């Protein structure tokens, strides 16, 4: 049984919600400043409320610190360092300045305890699907560009996602910024030869600092063959094939029977869809994502590799560069939230999302069967092991009629894209 304490009640309540569902742990208390919210949280989760670690009589194995760090004018990183020096494993909620990160990792290594950064967005199913699909396409196509819309409050998770997508955020070259008295400011950077355009909502409502968001984030990665988009942290993830006009003198009249492969594709594919209500995202999705970070701290915590630490430090440094380019957020007042019921909107037909979610599972099974059938057919006609063939040699070996050669080329491309064969 691991004893865990949570620091902070604002975002800490999501940690408490995650912890209450986990096995093999005991929540020994909530440590906070003693606000009305803190007392209410402690009562709701039926745990003690402390204002100092010295008040805690039980052993503490792990501390979840959900308090603003120095980057946001808080004491979260200092609290984490104090706990690490006491030999307590620590999970510190993002964002964290790279200098504070370096100090925490160094103390953790000296004390032989675990230190990690909490970042629930990386654990969300839609984000995981997006990252995996970017890697799939990147095996055969080069990233041409990345476009990002975001609220600066979640800029750290966005940078972390880009770090997973690109594997490195160096070298970071600032191409230019457009800032002014407008809600969204833009910044363009280049990482290697990949341009990334950020459009950031960089305002803070002085009466509602945490709640004034026009959006969280949206990320689009462009390739020669299309664009992959994560529309929201909770989905959907959509692939839009690139528009490419056929090289024909007569286009509409000949597409019915002589369309190129790209013209036979849908104009969009839903790769992940989850039409959950917002309350279920807060109630279930976020706590489940946080639990995955906590498990790394609780279940056999191992010392992170130097390569992993360097990547986290580099991501944090890239975050600092992004925010430096955008500048300080503009303080605004008088803004308000207005709920607009979605049923008032014009909905002319069943959405593509609804149709696709019903068919997606069956399509995946069917596609897999087709791939295996193609592969089996090739194996039946080619007996030699570890021997390379050109596509023309394969076609000749199979004995395909000329009219069906384009289909076999398509087969070979699909099999290669899905790692059944390799170039």
Indicate where each model-derived feature is located.
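N-terminal Rossmann-like dinucleotide-binding module
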Residues: 1-45
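Beta-loop-alpha module in the N-terminal Rossmann-like domain of NAD(P)-dependent dehydrogenases
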Residues: 15, 45-107
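Hydrophobic beta-strand scaffold residues
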Residues: 27, 49, 90, 114-115
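C-terminal helix-rich "cap/oligomerization" subdomain common to oxidoreductases
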Residues: 42, 62-67, 283-340
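A contiguous active-site-proximal alpha/beta segment in oxidoreductase catalytic domains
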Residues: 97-163
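Rossmann-like dinucleotide-binding domain that binds NAD(P)(H)
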Residues: 143-236, 245-246
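C-terminal glycine/acidic-rich active-site capping loop/insertion
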Residues: 228-307, 332
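N-terminal accessory segments
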Residues: 338-423
């Amino acid at each position: 049984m691991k004893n865990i304490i949570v620091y902070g009640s604002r975002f800490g309540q999501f940690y408490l919600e995650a912890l209450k569902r986990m096995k093999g742990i005991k929540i020994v208390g909530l440590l906070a400043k003693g606000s009305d919210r803190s007392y209410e949280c402690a009562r709701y989760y039926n745990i003690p409320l402390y204002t100092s670690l010295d008040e805690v009589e039980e052993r503490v194995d792990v501390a979840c610190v959900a308090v603003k760090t120095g980057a946001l004018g808080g004491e979260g990183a200092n609290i984490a360092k104090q706990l690490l020096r006491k030999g307590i494993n620590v999970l510190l909620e993002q964002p964290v300045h790279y200098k504070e990160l370096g100090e925490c990792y160094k103390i953790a290594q000296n004390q032989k305890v675990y230190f990690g950064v909490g970042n629930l967005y990386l654990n969300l199913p839609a984000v995981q699907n997006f990252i995996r699909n970017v890697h799939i396409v990147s095996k055969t196509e080069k990233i041409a560009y990345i476009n990002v819309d975001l609220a600066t409050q979640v800029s750290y998770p966005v940078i972390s996602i880009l770090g997973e997508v690109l594997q490195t955020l160096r070298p970071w070259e600032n191409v230019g910024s457009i800032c002014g008295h407008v809600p969204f400011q833009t910044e363009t950077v280049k990482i290697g030869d990949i341009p990334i355009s950020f459009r950031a909502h960089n305002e803070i409502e002085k009466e509602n600092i945490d709640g004034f968001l026009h959006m969280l984030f949206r990320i689009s990665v462009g390739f020669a063959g299309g664009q992959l988009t994560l529309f929201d942290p909770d989905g959907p993830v959509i692939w839009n094939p690139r528009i490419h006009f056929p090289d024909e003198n007569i286009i509409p009249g000949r597409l019915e029977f002589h369309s190129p492969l790209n013209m036979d594709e849908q104009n969009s594919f839903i790769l992940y869809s989850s039409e959950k209500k917002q309350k279920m995202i807060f109630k279930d999705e976020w706590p489940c994502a946080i639990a995955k970070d906590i498990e790394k701290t609780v279940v056999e915590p191992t010392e992170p590799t130097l390569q992993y630490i360097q990547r986290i430090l580099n991501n944090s440094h890239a975050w600092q560069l992004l925010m430096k380019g955008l500048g300080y957020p503009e303080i605004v007042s008088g803004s308000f939230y207005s709920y607009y019921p979605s049923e008032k909107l014009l909905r002319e037909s069943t959405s593509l999302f609804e149709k696709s979610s019903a068919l997606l599972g069956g399509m995946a099974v069917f596609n897999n069967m087709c791939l295996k059938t193609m592969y089996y057919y090739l194996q039946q006609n080619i007996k030699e092991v570890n021997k390379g063939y050109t596509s023309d040699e394969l076609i000749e070996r199979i004995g395909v009629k000329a009219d069906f050669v384009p289909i076999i080329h398509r087969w070979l491309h699909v099999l290669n894209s899905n790692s059944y064969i390799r170039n």
